[in-house]
Amino acid sequence: VTRHGPSLELAEQVAGRVGLSFSASRKETVASAIDRVMVRRGIGEGRLLLDRLGSDEDLTEDVISAVTVAETHFFRGPEQFELIRQTILPELLRRRPEGSPLRIWSVGCATGEEPYSLAILCEEEGLLDGVRIDAADISRRALAAAKTGDYGEWALRNTGPRLRQRYFTSCEGRFRLNEQLRRQVDFAHLNLGTDALPAPEKRLSDFDLILCRNVLVYLEASAVRRIARQLLDCLSDGGWLLTAP
């Protein structure tokens, strides 16, 4: 495959190589993103890109960052956070064995806004000490950014002044999440396209609540069905899986 404009065939090959499977409506956008990576990297032919994927970690991360959607913000989808606060957490707490922490997993966490929002919510409800939050994403760069807990104004556009003042330190237009909350979230790399789930040896099983939002909408139907089944298998009895918006 030679690069002269976005190639849907190349996009499918590249996506498959990094363990992704995009819906038809998304493939043209993915092809354009891959083309931009090739131009920036000076890679003239698709076969050269394919040859380097996997062995060239930096290039692989470039491609993953280009073709995945990392736009998010704190308390995105506020109606679901209200559902968690008013319904899901109380129900889970009622049936939780004494001394056993609630386990929450944010899948496709991008730069960390979602799991940190969950940590803030649990702290606001006085529950954080009894909750364990894990978070995972395919992009190692996004995970590295998440671990810093450092955000701009746009990421906090749904976060009111009281929460900002209580949980963030501001400096020159940036907001740093308090260390206490950062320590409550464990981040790990995960490729939903290639990694086997459940994975008890990696503590990726028996979750009480799993959030996989704004991920499945970009994947083809067969991948969505497979991943949804795997995530359901990662739940504890009576656990919840949230997949929207």
Indicate residue ranges for each PLM-predicted region.
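A short glycine-rich, Lys/Arg-flanked "PGG" loop and its adjoining helix->strand segment in the class I
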Residues: 225-237
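Conserved class I S-adenosyl-L-methionine
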Residues: 98-117, 131-134
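Active-site catalytic pocket residues across diverse enzymes, especially alpha/beta-hydrolases
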Residues: 88, 92, 122-126, 150
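Extended basic-aromatic, gly/pro-enriched interface segments that bind polyanionic ligands
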Residues: 107, 129-211, 215-223
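Conserved AdoMet
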Residues: 1-105
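A structural alpha-helix within SAM-dependent methyltransferase catalytic domains
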Residues: 85, 116-123, 232
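Conserved beta-strand signature within the Rossmann-like core of class I S-adenosyl-L-methionine
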Residues: 237-245
